[in-house]
A protein has these predicted regions:
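A solvent-exposed interaction/effector surface
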Residues: 2-205
Length: 205
């Protein structure tokens, strides 16, 4: 199933479901989210670093800059803009996370200023979604890395997690950072080569 089809299916559901779960090492309670496997193609992209505390406004400005550069270089755009987390939420503290805006393209792209050209690896990904915007990403990370991946005996393949923003509503009197958005997340995953502890299971079988 294509990534966009999976996202649309998630958007049509009540995305967050089930009783909250306590995840070891996480503060408070974390909800349960829909998640499933999808396959992404390897490709190239224009990328631009984002501030760690970026907003929707800053994200839009970065997307616009990448789109303008793609038009100047006559590069076909192959997907909607995305942003990526360069890090492992299960291992790296939030103050070490780095984000960048990503515009998938084809053709002979050239770097310009702080915009670079990168290879975006494909392969199997776990696709999930939160309808609660940027502020709920940490909760989604905790669910995926603390519960979903261990339950499937999977682990992060590489520390590069893609995200796509979907507008849910935008009223004329609302600011850009108050727009209701859903965030789709794509985690590159692989079967674990060593036993992965599952919350709630005893270490002794």
């Amino acid at each position: 199933m294509a990534a966009d089809e999976i996202t649309q299916k998630h958007l049509q559901r009540q995305r967050v479901r089930g009783a909250p779960s306590t995840i070891p090492g996480a503060g408070g309670m974390v909800g349960s989210y829909d998640a499933e496997e999808t396959w992404r193609q390897t490709g190239r992209a224009l990328v631009l670093p984002l501030e760690r505390s970026f907003t929707l406004q800053g994200l839009r400005e970065s997307y616009a800059r990448l789109t303008e550069l793609a038009e100047q270089q006559k590069l076909p755009v192959t997907e909607e803009p995305m942003f990526a987390l360069k890090g492992d939420p299960n291992e790296d503290p939030p103050h070490k996370w780095e984000y960048e805006a990503v515009l998938p393209i084809r053709g002979g792209a050239k770097p310009e200023g702080d915009v670079t050209v990168a290879r975006i690896q494909g392969g199997m990904h776990i696709a999930s979604l939160t309808p609660r915007g940027l502020g709920d990403l940490k909760g989604l990370y905790v669910y995926l890395f603390g519960k979903f991946l261990p339950s499937k005996k999977q682990q992060l393949m590489r520390p590069y997690i893609l995200h796509r923003v979907h507008l849910l509503s935008e009223g004329p009197e609302r600011g850009l950072d108050d727009v209701a958005v859903a965030i789709a997340v794509y985690v590159p995953a692989v079967l674990s080569i060593k036993p992965v502890p599952v919350p709630g299971e005893s270490a002794e079988a």
